[in-house]
């Protein structure tokens, strides 16, 4: 088996793992919403969309046969992570400055108008405020954990692309 095939397999395993982690994070958010009664705000929902896009692009990328198609989907994963960084970063900033609102009046109709809000309202419909402080998990707020996950994704996926493309094929 050539080094090219080994690197591509490693990348695909990484993408599958990333997709599973993103789906687990969405599942955790749904658990906190339904069981712990923590209502999601517009920025929480946008972070769920980013996680969902990362998972979808990661799974599709892992199923692609060639190096170029895998790289294309890894690029889409990175772009989705950057969108998640924007939403989570804004959410962290709002939690640090509770006097400023995330503009629920402005964002709520936009987020609730997205297709998944009508198809799966429990998971993708806004029902809370961004300034609501929920108990931290291991010392960090959920928005801080999400920001950490998005930053790691936005750094590790391109690093994987660069590292594996430097290898001679």
Curated annotation (Swiss-Prot):
Residues in compartment: Cytoplasmic: 1-14, 66-72, 164-169
Domain of life: Bacteria
UniProt main location, coarse: membrane
Protein name (Swiss-Prot/TrEMBL): Disulfide bond formation protein B 1
Function as written in the Swiss-Prot or TrEMBL entry: Required for disulfide bond formation in some periplasmic proteins. Acts by oxidizing the DsbA protein.
Lineage: Bacteria, Pseudomonadati, Pseudomonadota, Gammaproteobacteria, Pseudomonadales
Molecular function terms from GO: electron transfer activity; protein-disulfide reductase activity
Topology in membrane: Multi-pass membrane protein
Keyword Cell membrane applies: yes
Pfam families referenced in this protein's UniProt entry, alphabetically: DsbB (PF02600)
A GO-annotated cellular component: plasma membrane
Record keywords: Cell inner membrane, Cell membrane, Chaperone, Disulfide bond, Electron transport, Membrane, Oxidoreductase, Redox-active center, Transmembrane, Transmembrane helix, Transport
Segments on the Periplasmic face: 32-49, 90-144
Sequence intervals crossing the membrane: 15-31, 50-65, 73-89, 145-163
Family: Belongs to the DsbB family.
Cell compartments where the protein resides: Cell inner membrane
Organism: Pseudomonas syringae pv. syringae (strain B728a)
NCBIfam families: PRK02110.1
Any GO BP: protein folding
Alphabetical list of Gene3D superfamilies matching this protein: DsbB-like
Disulfide bond entries: 41-44, 102-130
